[in-house]
């Protein structure tokens, strides 16, 4: 159970950092795919 908690915290922190950097910079590739 501890392993699951640690992995969840690790993935959540990495996801927050990734989204922070992703939304801070202009997503040119994402806009091209969506449009």
Swiss-Prot record:
Source organism: Asarum canadense (Wild ginger)
Family: Belongs to the PsbT family.
GO CC field: chloroplast thylakoid membrane; photosystem II reaction center
Annotated SUPFAM superfamilies: Photosystem II reaction center protein T, PsbT
Protein name: Photosystem II reaction center protein T
GO biological process, alphabetically ordered: photosynthesis
UniProt keyword Glycosyltransferase, yes or no: no
Localisation: Plastid, Chloroplast thylakoid membrane
Quaternary organization: PSII is composed of 1 copy each of membrane proteins PsbA, PsbB, PsbC, PsbD, PsbE, PsbF, PsbH, PsbI, PsbJ, PsbK, PsbL, PsbM, PsbT, PsbY, PsbZ, Psb30/Ycf12, at least 3 peripheral proteins of the oxygen-evolving complex and a large number of cofactors. It forms dimeric complexes.
The organism's place on the tree of life at top rank: Eukaryota
Chain's role: Found at the monomer-monomer interface of the photosystem II (PS II) dimer, plays a role in assembly and dimerization of PSII. PSII is a light-driven water plastoquinone oxidoreductase, using light energy to abstract electrons from H(2)O, generating a proton gradient subsequently used for ATP formation.
Keywords, ordered alphabetically: Chloroplast, Membrane, Photosynthesis, Photosystem II, Plastid, Thylakoid, Transmembrane, Transmembrane helix
Pfam families found in the cross-reference section: PsbT
Membrane protein topology class: Single-pass membrane protein
Positions of transmembrane segments: 3-23
